[in-house]
C-alpha cells in the first residue's frame, strides 16, 4: 500500500494505496460522490504516508494489514511523485519490484483482487532538487512525460 486510500463499492470494494499528497484533495470523498451519482454505495478506508516510496509501503506491515482487512476487488497503488520519473535503471531497481510485491500480495489475499496503478503527478516547476543530475525532470512537462 502506498500512501493510501481504500475505496469500496458494495458488494465490491476498492483500496487505494498512494504515496503522494492526493490525501489533501479528498479523493475518497470525490470517489464516493462519483459512485453515489451512479447509485452505488461505497466504502472508503485510507492509509496515507505523504512522500513515501513503493519500497516504504512494501516494507510497512500496516500496508498488509489494510490489504487483509477486507476482500478488495481493486487495490489501487500510486507511487511517490518523483519516483517514476527517475532514470529507468533506478525505477527498475527501487520502484517496480516493490510495486509488483504489493500488487502480487493483493492478488494472493483475494484471487478476485485486481491491482491498478494510479498515475502520480508532475511537480508544477519540475523536480528542481534532481534537475542537475537528471535534466529530464527540470520542467513540469519533462517530468510529466517520464511519469
Locate predicted features.
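Substrate-gating cap/lid alpha-helix
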Residues: 127-147
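Short beta-alpha junction loops
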Residues: 119-124
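Internal, well-ordered alpha-helical segments in soluble enzyme and binding-protein domains
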Residues: 98, 102, 143-146
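Conserved SGNH/GDSL esterase-like catalytic core that processes O-acyl groups on lipids
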Residues: 8-100, 111
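Short polar catalytic/cofactor-binding loops
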Residues: 2-7
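Short, solvent-exposed loop/turn segments at secondary-structure junctions
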Residues: 85, 125-126
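A short helix->loop->beta-strand "cap" motif at the edges of active sites that frequently abuts
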Residues: 104-115
Amino acid at each position: 500500500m502506498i500512501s493510501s486510500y481504500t475505496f469500496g463499492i458494495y458488494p465490491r470494494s476498492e483500496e487505494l494505496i498512494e504515496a503522494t499528497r492526493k490525501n489533501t484533495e479528498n479523493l475518497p470523498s470525490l470517489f464516493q460522490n462519483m459512485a453515489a451519482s451512479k447509485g452505488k454505495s461505497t466504502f472508503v478506508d485510507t492509509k496515507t504516508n505523504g512522500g513515501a516510496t513503493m519500497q516504504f509501503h512494501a516494507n510497512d506491515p500496516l500496508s498488509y494489514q489494510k490489504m487483509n482487512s477486507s476482500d478488495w476487488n481493486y487495490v489501487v497503488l500510486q507511487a511517490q511523485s518523483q519516483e517514476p520519473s527517475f532514470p529507468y535503471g533506478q525505477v527498475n531497481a527501487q520502484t517496480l519490484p516493490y510495486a509488483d510485491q504489493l500488487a502480487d500480495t493483493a492478488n494472493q489475499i483475494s484471487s478476485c483482487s485486481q491491482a491498478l496503478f494510479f498515475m502520480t503527478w508532475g511537480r508544477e516547476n519540475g523536480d528542481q532538487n534532481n534537475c542537475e543530475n537528471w535534466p529530464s525532470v527540470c520542467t513540469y512537462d519533462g517530468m510529466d512525460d517520464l511519469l
